[in-house]
């Protein structure tokens, strides 16, 4: 665990694109169609960007995860630690959580997998598809046509198929993905998973849940806040 490279620089995604509910202008979302991917690219980008942020906007600290759906260590974190972190810190209002994509060049299917999650995010279902990407990686990374699988899984979680498939096959969320990638590179990130806690403390790679909690708690204690 080290000091984070360039505090604040990891959030260039938002400043570059002007997107996001917490960091940019809000988007009007129809209550009648919560799981429909909109046709307008700007709206897709705005909704996808804000969907990958979870937790109370007034939370005292922020946790950023830089990740790759095809990375085995990222999957290990998801399976072993992510739900505990979410329960103790995010759902309790202690931390706001932001997921940033940083696919490795040796992972050819990682890019479309990120698109699958961001297109789902445009329909308000980012985290549901995020979980599926990690839990079914062995299926999609070897599929002849992973997009067809992604559409099938999107329907499983209540997303309308036509708009979702259009989003995928036309690379609609690509600007958000490129901004994520460039932002991580400029911040000196070279591998995944990589975490930044409280804009100050970096966690590189997979660590035990005990060490992860200790890192978060150290930031809270340094700010005079209670730990869970």
Which sequence ranges carry the predicted segments?
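Bacterial N-terminal signal peptides that target proteins for export
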Residues: 1-15
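Bacterial N-terminal signal peptides
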Residues: 11-25
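N-proximal helix/coil linker or "cap" segments that precede and/or mark the start of modular domains
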Residues: 27-43
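C-terminal cap of thioredoxin/glutaredoxin-like
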Residues: 32, 66, 82, 151-228
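Residue-level recognition of alpha-helix termini/interfacial anchor residues
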Residues: 41, 125, 136, 171-173
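A short beta-strand-turn-helix
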Residues: 44-61, 89
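Structural alpha/beta surface segment adjacent to cysteine/selenocysteine redox centers
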Residues: 59, 64-155, 185, 190, ...
């Amino acid at each position: 665990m080290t000091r984070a490279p360039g505090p604040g620089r990891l959030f260039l995604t938002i400043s570059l694109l002007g997107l996001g509910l917490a960091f940019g202008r809000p988007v009007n979302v129809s209550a009648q169609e919560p799981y429909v991917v909109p046709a307008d690219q700007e709206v897709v980008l705005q909704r996808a960007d804000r969907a990958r942020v979870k937790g109370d906007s007034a939370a005292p600290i922020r946790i950023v995860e830089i990740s790759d759906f095809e990375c085995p260590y990222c999957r290990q974190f998801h399976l072993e630690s992510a739900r505990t972190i979410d329960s103790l810190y995010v759902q309790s209002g202690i931390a706001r959580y932001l997921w940033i994509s940083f696919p490795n060049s040796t992972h050819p299917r990682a890019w479309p997998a990120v698109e699958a999650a961001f297109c789902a995010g445009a329909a308000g279902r980012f985290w549901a598809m995020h979980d599926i990407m990690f839990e079914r990686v062995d299926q999609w990374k070897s599929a002849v046509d992973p997009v067809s699988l992604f559409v099938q899984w999107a329907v499983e979680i209540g997303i309308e198929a036509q708009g979702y498939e259009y989003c995928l096959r036309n690379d609609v969320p690509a600007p958000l993905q490129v901004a994520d990638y460039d932002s991580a590179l400029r911040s000196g990130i070279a591998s995944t998973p990589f975490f930044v806690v409280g804009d100050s403390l970096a966690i590189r790679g997979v660590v035990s849940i005990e060490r992860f909690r200790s890192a978060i708690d150290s930031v809270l204690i340094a700010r005079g806040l209670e730990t869970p």
